[in-house]
């Protein structure tokens, strides 16, 4: 039965991929949402870290785009909890206006998949998302 394929090797189309955006900046959320929806991704939005954790559990996204500095719970705490509580790790891209290399190192230690500094080009974000979800 070598001719039979148990599973299609092609990546799933963007339309089937679910992305959770967690950021307290409405302008950044709107820009990311517009860019990602235009590529066919299904978008969910949380405005703070606690809401982000609740939505991640409820919506089971394929990828989370997470701001580092937010009210109620920082992106670091959200990332740490996502890594501790999910049986299958979700892909996470952390975004930040912070220039410090210590923050990037800490995010990497917590298991972030990629790290983008604000301001970033939407093309760079889309490229990162497509690479991580391929």
Residues of each region from the PLM?
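Charged docking surfaces used in two-component/phosphorelay signaling
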Residues: 30-38
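C-terminal output helix
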Residues: 120-130
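Alpha4 helix (beta4-alpha4-beta5 surface) of REC/receiver domains from two-component response regulators
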Residues: 33, 77, 99-114, 127
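The short loop immediately C-terminal to the conserved phospho-acceptor aspartate in CheY-like receiver
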Residues: 25, 68-69
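Active-site beta3 strand of CheY-like receiver
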Residues: 59-65
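Acidic catalytic/metal-coordinating carboxylates
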Residues: 48-51, 74-78
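The feature encodes the CheY-like receiver
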Residues: 29, 71-72, 100
């Amino acid at each position: 039965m070598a001719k039979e394929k148990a599973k299609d090797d092609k990546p799933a189309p963007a339309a089937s991929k679910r992305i959770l955006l967690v950021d307290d900046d409405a302008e950044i959320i709107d820009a990311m949402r517009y860019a990602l929806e235009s590529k066919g991704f299904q978008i969910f939005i949380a405005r703070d870290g606690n809401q982000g954790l609740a939505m991640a559990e409820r919506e089971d996204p394929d990828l989370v785009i997470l701001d580092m500095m937010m009210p109620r719970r920082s992106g670091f705490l959200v990332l740490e909890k996502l890594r501790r509580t999910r049986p299958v790790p979700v892909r996470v891209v952390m975004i930040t206006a912070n220039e410090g290399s210590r923050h990037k190192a800490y995010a990497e230690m917590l298991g972030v998949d990629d790290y983008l500094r604000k301001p970033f080009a939407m093309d760079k974000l889309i490229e990162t998302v497509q690479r991580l979800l391929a």
